[in-house]
From Swiss-Prot:
Known function: Heterodimerizes with IL12B to form the IL-12 cytokine or with EBI3/IL27B to form the IL-35 cytokine. IL-12 is primarily produced by professional antigen-presenting cells (APCs) such as B-cells and dendritic cells (DCs) as well as macrophages and granulocytes and regulates T-cell and natural killer-cell responses, induces the production of interferon-gamma (IFN-gamma), favors the differentiation of T-helper 1 (Th1) cells and is an important link between innate resistance and adaptive immunity.
Family (UniProt): Belongs to the IL-6 superfamily.
Complexes and interactors: Heterodimer with IL12B; disulfide-linked. This heterodimer is known as interleukin IL-12. Heterodimer with EBI3/IL27B; not disulfide-linked. This heterodimer is known as interleukin IL-35. Interacts with NBR1; this interaction promotes IL-12 secretion.
Gene Ontology cellular-component terms listed: interleukin-12 complex
Organism superkingdom: Eukaryota
Main localisation: secreted
A matching Pfam family: IL12
GO terms of biological process kind: immune response; interleukin-12-mediated signaling pathway
Organism, as annotated: Sus scrofa
Gene Ontology terms, MF aspect: cytokine activity; growth factor activity; interleukin-12 receptor binding
Protein name from the UniProt record: Interleukin-12 subunit alpha
Subcellular location: Secreted
Length: 222
């Protein structure tokens, strides 16, 4: 093949590759970060810090309760109730929005994390799922703290900073969903079991807080 044909072939391939990227770019939902998203990023960072501090304190205080990540039985209270991990995939990896949409209830979105008129469906779905996660954990932690306050040993309580951080991020998201409010699990008042359950929940919630913080960082940089 002559040099001219080689040059034309390379130029054609480069052009086709460029057009393919442009087509892909047009097919992706647009997400524009605004001041509200930056505020939510700050709240998610505060939440991750508060959860990490609370978990560290629990591991130190409950050192004889098998409270390390290697010792506990991992449990996700949001399993089969929310789809945060799937809904919060980066937009370029989310290939089937309709499958995710089918798993959600209708939503009324008033959150200041959203940029009016510029937020994709996938972003809204992700943030609403995060809100539902926070709501479930908040209910569980409040019920658990009520039990811990009845413990004669007064050994450990939940850090108010963590509960406040959850509330602040929920307020920033400000989703009003039609889902039925979650009820805390009703168990026998066994303080040993409650403390073990606290460790399990804190480990699970910290993992979820990492996911939330990473997603807020991603949306803020979009």
């Amino acid at each position: 093949m002559c040099p001219l044909r080689n040059l034309l072939l390379v130029a054609t391939l480069v052009l086709l590759n460029h057009l393919d990227h442009l087509s892909l770019g047009r097919s992706l939902p647009a997400t524009t970060a605004g001041p509200g998203m930056f505020k939510c990023l700050n709240h998610s960072q505060n939440l991750l810090k508060a959860v990490s501090n609370t978990l560290q304190k629990a591991k130190q205080t409950l050192e004889f309760y098998s409270c390390t990540s290697e010792e506990i039985d991992h449990e996700d209270i949001t399993k089969d109730k929310t789809s945060t991990v799937e809904a919060c995939l980066p937009l370029e990896l989310a290939t089937n929005e309709s499958c995710l949409a089918a798993r959600e209830t209708s939503l009324i979105t008033n959150g200041n994390c959203l940029t009016s008129g510029k937020t994709s469906f996938m972003t809204t779905l992700c943030l609403s799922s995060i809100y539902e996660d926070l709501k479930m954990y908040h209910v569980e932690f409040q019920a658990m703290n009520a039990k811990l306050l009845m413990d004669p040993k007064r050994q450990i309580f939940l850090d108010q900073n963590m509960l406040t951080a959850i509330t602040e991020l929920m307020q920033a998201l400000n989703f009003n969903s039609e889902t039925v409010p979650q009820k805390p699990s009703l168990e026998e008042l066994d303080f040993y079991k409650t403390k073990i359950k606290l460790c399990i929940l804190l480990h699970a919630f910290r993992i979820r807080a990492v996911t939330i913080d990473r997603m807020m960082s991603y949306l803020n940089s979009s």
